[in-house]
Amino acid sequence: MADKNERAIKVVAENRKARFNYAIEDTIEAGISLTGTEVKSVRSGKSTIAESYADSRGGEIWLINANIPEYLQANRFNHEPKRPRKLLLHRKQINKLMGAVERQGMTLIPLKLYFNEKGRAKLLLALAKGKQLHDKRETEKKRDWSREKGRLLRARG
């Protein structure tokens, strides 16, 4: 049996550019439907969600363009690396997210792919609005200033 320290949340993939390219409005945790070889490949830590997004098809939400490479030890029963993957959400959550996407022109982007305490694959999904170029520049200036401020405070002692 694993200790409590070993059962902590294990982040496997992170979309680091998402917070720079989008203004995050709301986040929601969703389960993700994976096959056996996909789970093993995700556990190895080689999956990427940097250029992926979520979209609705037939009243369900799907993760599009997420790259989970083929599992090396699997033979002919391997999975397709960029196939759409179903996200597991309650109907109320799906309606809320799709309403925001359709009415307010928002986007669903994944922020993190991780395993929770129970060992289930979860995806932190964000309801976001794309930033304009000047907003990105402003974010970069704020980040640079906060770094510079920290350096100055450390130098003064």
Swiss-Prot record:
- A Pfam family in this protein? SmpB
Could you tell me which residues belong to the region Disordered?
A: 135-157
* InterPro entries, per database record: SmpB, SsrA-bd_prot, SsrA-bd_prot_CS
Q: Which GO terms describe its molecular function?
A: RNA binding
An example of a Gene Ontology BP annotation on this entry? Answer: trans-translation
A GO CC term attached to the entry: cytosol
Localization terms from the record: Cytoplasm
Task: Please tell me where this protein is predominantly located.
Answer: cytoplasm
Compositional bias of kind Basic and acidic residues: 135-151
- Protein's UniProt keywords contain Repeat: no
> Which UniProt key words apply to this protein?
Cytoplasm, RNA-binding
> Does the keyword field hold Cytoplasm?
yes
Family membership = Belongs to the SmpB family.
Q: Which PANTHER family match?
A: SSRA-BINDING PROTEIN, TMRNA-BINDING COMPONENT OF TRANS-TRANSLATION TAGGING COMPLEX
Role summary: Required for rescue of stalled ribosomes mediated by trans-translation. Binds to transfer-messenger RNA (tmRNA), required for stable association of tmRNA with ribosomes. tmRNA and SmpB together mimic tRNA shape, replacing the anticodon stem-loop with SmpB. tmRNA is encoded by the ssrA gene; the 2 termini fold to resemble tRNA(Ala) and it encodes a 'tag peptide', a short internal open reading frame. During trans-translation Ala-aminoacylated tmRNA acts like a tRNA, entering the A-site of stalled ribosomes, displacing the stalled mRNA.
What is the designated name of this protein? SsrA-binding protein
Q: Which organism is it from?
A: Rhodopseudomonas palustris (strain BisB5)
User: What lineage is this protein's organism placed in?
Assistant: Bacteria, Pseudomonadati, Pseudomonadota, Alphaproteobacteria, Hyphomicrobiales
Query: Gene encoding this polypeptide?
Result: smpB
